[in-house]
Regions:
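Hydrophobic positions on the alpha1 helix immediately C-terminal to the Walker A/P-loop
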Residues: 258
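Conserved internal helical-beta-strand scaffold that buttresses enzyme catalytic cores
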Residues: 2-253, 263-594
């Protein structure tokens, strides 16, 4: 067999895995359009994919996974570090030797009658100093075609790797899609990922969460950079100056919507624009000028389809109009297009649902699309994609924003007093599960820096790494750190802030703070805007001045309860908890007593 590379470490590993899984055929993915086209045709012939309407959705395909294989599985995801302590209390741990044995037993001969596809891919622009290379072996054309959208694939990647051994090994085996034998295992010390018995996106597109967050966060810890679950956006002012923001939110907090925000009309008329560099993952390093720079290591968007529409996110919708793969959405048989809940108010009557069954959207009680159905769309399709998207040096970060969903606790926005205080703010990030009763507070789920399911090593060490990164930055060069909460409610359970495009008003205040152009009020938790500094032009009818004051208010008694919750959470980490964070918690408590 002719390999696409002379790299001995790559060839040896592939030969070893061929012997393990016994494929009938082996195919290197060279990245050429001809080869990808042939694979699309083959997938449609075998029924693995369905070709959609060429006039309305050119180059688009539909795929359905098995009904028992529709989401990431956190309880089947393991960090196989040398000790349980290295994985930490927030991760599932498995002994590496035991894990390899178990996984190899499951994988053995699982490619019989199948083709092995070898996908060389780059996370980040090929050749960028930020970028890292991986090789994924898979028996799924669906995986190949998704990876060709989500990453940079092909021969140029292997040429860039040369003889280096700095690459991430990834083995994916669909096996029988048996949920009892489904495992997604990361081996940080070995730069290795093994995924078995799944064919769903996040579990099998190994460049995404497995590599770009779990493995890369560990690499960043060892190499002095950061892999973060953050969007990157550029805010352009009327003078044409662009400032960049990284932002981390737990799921269901509107990350993709914020990354592709369309400013309110008043802002657009003045010449404000938002540019999307990335909607999910940031790799961050210190640049030659002492500032932090970020790249989006991905090459596409793997977005949740339900709820995406012309109003909530027109840019994301536009990105899906060509060369996109849809997973587990409904198929409209009348015009061979796709539909999902929240797309419009007009569900098709003659359709096939996500499970492949006839479906009438007007009469059915069941959903046509799975709630976690997805689109995989090329980044270049997005109308607001940043001109810096391919910049190998990344973009300079002015602000880091954390956020969550809190009905009463956090104000609309506040700024940390310092870098370490900002790390504290990120470490206590949480969302309340939405409660049915109006105004009732849901269960608080801590999700530090939105990395709870994605941190590849002990979370306490991860926080210390944040503190160390900050210690290496000059204060005037370090990004300012903020927390936002679009989800504050009144006593009747109504949202107090309109959200969506109007979040631009908060981003504007954040940038003004970074530029030293506005003052703020100091509270027990940090700096909160003066009400007059949040621009309400055009939404005066929706947000009264009293309402704005309510959204910006800090209730110390609620924060006293919160401090107890933080203390309980921190206790999980024992003496590994960075002293800087326990100091910040003590400062918060002291401030609340004043």
């Amino acid at each position: 067999m002719k390999h696409l590379t002379q790299n001995k470490t790559v060839i040896d590993w592939i030969e070893e895995k061929i012997a393990l899984v016994s494929p009938d055929e082996v195919m290197w993915i060279d990245g050429s359009e001809e080869q990808l086209d042939a694979l699309r045709t083959k997938a449609c012939e075998t029924g693995e994919m369905t070709k959609l309407n060429e006039d309305l959705l050119p180059g688009c395909l539909l795929h359905r996974t098995k009904p028992n294989d529709v989401a990431r599985v956190e309880n089947r995801t393991f960090i196989c570090a040398e000790s349980a302590d290295q994985a930490g209390p927030t991760n599932n741990w498995m002994d590496p030797a035991e894990a390899y044995k178990m996984l190899y037993d499951i994988a053995r001969d699982s490619y019989k009658g199948r083709t092995m596809y070898i996908i060389p891919y780059s996370m980040g622009p090929v050749g960028s100093p930020f970028s890292k290379i991986g090789v994924e072996l898979t028996d799924s054309i669906y995986v190949v075609l998704n990876m060709a959208i989500m990453t940079r694939v092909g021969k140029k990647v292997m040429d860039t790797l040369g003889d280096s051994n700095d690459w991430v090994r990834g083995l994916h085996c669909s096996c029988d899609i048996d949920p009892e034998k489904r495992y997604i295992c990361q081996f940080p010390q070995d730069n290795t990922i093994i995924s078995v018995n799944s064919a769903y996106g996040g579990n099998v597109l190994l460049g995404k969460k497995c590599f770009a967050l779990r493995i890369a966060s560990y690499q960043g810890w060892k190499e002095g950079w950061q892999a973060e679950h953050m969007l990157i956006l550029g805010l352009e002012n009327p003078k044409g100056e662009v400032k960049y923001i990284c932002a981390a939110f737990p799921s269901a907090c509107g990350k993709t919507n914020l990354a592709m925000l369309i400013p309110p009309e008043g802002y657009r008329n003045k010449g404000y624009k938002i540019w999307c560099v990335g909607d999910d993952i940031s790799w961050i390093r210190k640049g030659p000028d002492g500032r932090l720079y970020a790249i989006n290591p991905e090459n596409g968007f793997f977005g949740v389809a339900p709820g995406t529409n012309e109003k909530s996110n027109p840019n994301a919708l536009a990105a899906t109009r060509k060369n996109t793969i849809f997973t587990n959405v409904a198929l409209n048989l009348d015009n061979n297009t796709v539909w999902w809940e929240g797309l419009d108010k007009n569900p098709p009557e003659n359709a096939i649902d996500w499970q492949g069954r006839p479906w009438n959207g007007k009469t059915s009680e069941e959903k046509g699309a799975h709630p976690n159905s997805r689109f995989t769309a090329p980044a270049v399709n997005c109308p607001c994609i940043s001109s810096e998207f391919e910049n190998p040096a990344g973009v300079p970060i002015s602000a880091i924003v954390f956020g969550g969903r809190r009905a009463k606790l956090a104000p609309l926005v506040y700024q940390s007093r310092s870098w370490n205080h900002g790390v504290f703010v990120g470490s206590i990030m949480a969302s309340e599960t939405t409660a049915a009763a109006a105004g009732a507070v849901g269960v608080v789920r801590r999700d530090p820096m939105a990395m709870l399911p994605f941190c590849g090593y002990n979370m306490a060490d991860y926080w210390q790494h944040w503190i160390d990164i900050g210690a290496g930055l000059d204060e005037d060069k370090a990004p300012k750190i903020f927390n936002v909460n679009w989800f504050r409610k009144d006593d009747d359970g109504n949202f107090l802030w309109p959200g969506f495009g109007d979040n631009m008003r908060v981003l504007e205040w954040i940038i003004k703070r970074c530029e030293g152009k506005v003052d703020a009020d100091e509270t027990a938790i940090g700096f909160v805007p003066k009400a007059e500094d949040i621009n309400l032009e055009g939404i005066e009818d929706e947000v009264s001045e009293d309402q704005l004051k309510e959204i910006l208010s800090v209730d110390n008694s609620l924060w006293e309860d919160e401090a107890k919750g933080i203390e309980e959470f921190y206790a999980k980490f024992g003496d590994r908890l960075p002293k800087a964070l326990s100091d910040e918690l003590n400062t918060l408590k002291a401030n609340l007593e004043k």
